[in-house]
């Protein structure tokens, strides 16, 4: 009874903090409050509080249920939110190198935590006895590695998507054409002395615009390089987790069902996802290929992860149907 009450308290605390942080993020996005009051730093601290709240929630549920809390969709979502919070905290405490990971990890943790604790999964938070197939020491190894892999791959893929958005965004200034038109117009209407004065003034304005465009494009280039740098490293880490998760799942399947691979829907989509990110890593090793190509592959992998993660849960079929929406 005590553990159940504590679990509900931690759930409400984490969800309340997440809601406040989400509100702060929307306000800072709309009216740029971070320059006025410093709300953005407060939202980062809110994610840290949420991390400890989710950690306490997982440990409480572990003690209360008697097994590692990864037996259904609700628990896996909480663990996925916890994984995003870890990545966010690494970015938060590593302030010597300025990066933009928190712009990806914080909203991701917020929405996943909000979905997991919302009324959409009101039947799933109740802890239940594990089915015989899940009563194994491989549960912690296999599922935790898969969820950590999902979290890292989703984060890296979102960084790649952001890279594509920034790369294909139209930046070319129209100042050049306007100045050329003004120059010919003034040349026809004014005398040489007047035109010389105006032309000098326009040259100064043009030089200022060139400097502004150069600094903006330089910052844009630096941002693209940083997104590519972090996405490659996070996806590489997630690929390792995913590989370990698939291999441990194969060993577990052999012990339970007598076969390493059964082409279950979840297994099939996990293999497809693994192949896509293997292609991504192969592309990154080729220096002659642009970063845009690898970012496109990572964007495809982003969709495949959600299909792999939610597809079987929505259908409720196959050997992994115990984690579906309909199973509880």
Swiss-Prot record:
The keyword Disulfide bond does not apply. GO terms for cellular component: chloroplast thylakoid membrane; plasma membrane. InterPro entries: Cyt_c_assembly (IPR002541), Cyt_c_biogenesis_CcsA (IPR017562), Cyt_c_biogenesis_CcsA/CcmC (IPR045062). Keywords: Chloroplast, Cytochrome c-type biogenesis, Membrane, Plastid, Thylakoid, Transmembrane, Transmembrane helix. One of its GO terms (biological process) is cytochrome complex assembly. One of its GO terms (molecular function) is heme binding. It is a multi-pass membrane protein. It holds the Pfam family Cytochrom_C_asm. It is found in: Plastid, Chloroplast thylakoid membrane. The chain crosses the membrane at residues 13-33, 46-66, 73-93, 101-121, 146-166, 234-254, 263-283, 295-315. Its main location: plastid. PANTHER family: CYTOCHROME B_B6 PROTEIN-RELATED (PTHR30071:SF1), HEME EXPORTER PROTEIN C (PTHR30071). May interact with Ccs1. Required during biogenesis of c-type cytochromes (cytochrome c6 and cytochrome f) at the step of heme attachment. NCBIfam families: cytochr_II_ccsB. Belongs to the CcmF/CycK/Ccl1/NrfE/CcsA family. This is Cytochrome c biogenesis protein CcsA. It comes from Barbarea verna (Land cress).
């Amino acid at each position: 009874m005590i553990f159940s009450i504590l679990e509900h308290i931690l759930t409400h605390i984490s969800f309340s903090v997440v809601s406040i942080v989400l509100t702060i993020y929307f306000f800072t996005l709309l009216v740029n409050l971070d320059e006025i009051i410093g709300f953005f730093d407060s939202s980062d601290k809110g994610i840290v509080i949420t991390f400890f709240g989710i950690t306490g929630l997982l440990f409480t549920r572990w003690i209360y249920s008697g097994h590692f809390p990864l037996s259904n969709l609700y628990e896996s979502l909480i663990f996925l939110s916890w994984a995003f919070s870890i990545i966010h905290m690494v970015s938060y405490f590593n302030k010597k190198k300025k990066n933009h990971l928190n712009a990806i990890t914080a909203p991701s943790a917020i929405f996943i935590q909000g979905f997991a604790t919302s009324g959409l999964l009101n039947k799933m938070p109740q802890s239940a006895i594990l089915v015989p197939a899940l009563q194994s020491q491989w549960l912690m190894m296999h599922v935790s590695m898969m969820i950590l892999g999902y979290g890292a791959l989703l984060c890296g893929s979102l960084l790649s998507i952001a890279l594509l958005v920034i790369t294909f965004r139209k930046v070319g200034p129209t100042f050049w054409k306007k100045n050329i038109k003004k120059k010919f117009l003034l040349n026809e209407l004014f005398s040489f002395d007047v035109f010389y004065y105006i032309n000098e003034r326009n040259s100064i304005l043009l030089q200022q615009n060139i400097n502004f465009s150069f600094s903006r494009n330089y910052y844009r280039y630096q941002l693209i390089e940083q997104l590519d740098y972090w996405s490659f490293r996070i996806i590489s880490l997630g690929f390792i987790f995913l590989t370990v998760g698939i291999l441990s799942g194969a060993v577990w399947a052999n012990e339970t069902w007598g076969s390493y691979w059964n082409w279950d829907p979840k297994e099939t989509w996990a293999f497809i996802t693994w192949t896509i990110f293997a292609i991504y890593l192969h592309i990154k090793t080729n220096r002659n290929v642009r970063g845009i190509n690898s970012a496109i592959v990572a964007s495809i992998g982003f969709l495949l992860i959600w299909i792999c993660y939610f597809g079987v849960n929505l259908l409720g079929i196959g050997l992994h149907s115990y984690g579906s929406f309909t199973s509880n």
